[in-house]
Each structure stands twice: as structure tokens, then as C-alpha cells.
Amino acid sequence: MAAGQGGWLRPALGLRLLLATAFQAVSALGAEFASEACRELGFSSNLLCSSCDLLGQFNLLPLDPVCRGCCQEEAQFETKKLYAGAILEVCGUKLGRFPQVQAFVRSDKPKLFRGLQIKYVRGSDPVLKLLDDNGNIAEELSILKWNTDSVEEFLSEKLERI
């Protein structure tokens, strides 16, 4: 074999060293990452700092400094803006490629949110469109990589629950 014994370990070791370097840089500087850098490290641009508090439950405390550098603080006294409704668009034929979105769509959870519509649009990747009081699209978000809990939590913040 050309790679030799243990050759497959080299890329994993390189990745670990890269992540360790990034973690050290963030902890040393206490700096915030740009959203692109956070995405490259595997963190969502919508990451809330309260999510970083959960890392200890999964023995992931070494990720805490990077998580804190990539997260957004929840506004404690800010009034939440509720939207009049939302449309979750997805292609029925592609739904199997997004099992987390599929689990949400096929569950009873969509019925918990006032004004939420599920629309099957041919060829569409999972998209969430938030509607203003006039029924116009106020925000449009790709939920391609969201899990079921993220979709439910986001909708809980943006729509009125029934």
C-alpha cells in the first residue's frame, strides 16, 4: 500500500490540529469570528449563546470558546416580533433528502403554529418564508440543514402558538 500503515490518520490529525489552533486563537483573543469563519468551523450563523451552555452535557466544553465567539446574545428585554404567518416550502420529491425537515412536516408540530402553511413546490429546497400583516414575504430563510428542533424553536420565536 502506498499510504502505508496508519496513512488514513494523517488527515484526521491535521483537522484536529487546525481546530485546536482555531480554539486557542479564539480563547486567547476572546474575539468574535466573522460569520463565514464560524460556518467553516461548523457553527450556524443563527447560533444563540444559550446553545453554548449545552456543550457541557455532551462533553464538548473545549468548543465553548469558539461557540461563544460565534454566537449571538438573545435580547433580554427586546419585545419579540411575531409574524402574521409563515410558509414552509419544500419539494415533495426531495423531502426524503432532508429527513429532519420531513420529520417536522409530517408530524403534528406544524398545527401548533398559527398561520403556518406547508407548500409543496416542485424542485424547491426547504425554505421558510415569514409573512408580514399584509401577507407579503418579510423574511426568507433556507432551512436546508436545520433539524426538527431548530425549526420548531425558530417558529416558536417568530409565530404565535395555538
UniProtKB/Swiss-Prot annotation:
Its main location: endoplasmic reticulum. It is found in: Endoplasmic reticulum lumen. Keywords: Endoplasmic reticulum, Selenocysteine, Signal. Forms a tight complex with UGGT1/UGCGL1. Interacts with UGGT2/UGCGL2. Interacts with RDH11. The gene is Selenof. Pfam families: Sep15_SelM (PF08806). Belongs to the selenoprotein M/F family. One of its GO terms (biological process) is 'de novo' post-translational protein folding. Residues 1-28 form the signal peptide. This is Selenoprotein F. One of its GO terms (cellular component) is endoplasmic reticulum lumen. May be involved in redox reactions associated with the formation of disulfide bonds. May contribute to the quality control of protein folding in the endoplasmic reticulum. May regulate protein folding by enhancing the catalytic activity of UGGT1/UGCGL1 and UGGT2/UGCGL2. Gene3D superfamilies: Sep15/SelM thioredoxin-like domain, active-site redox motif. It comes from the Eukaryota.
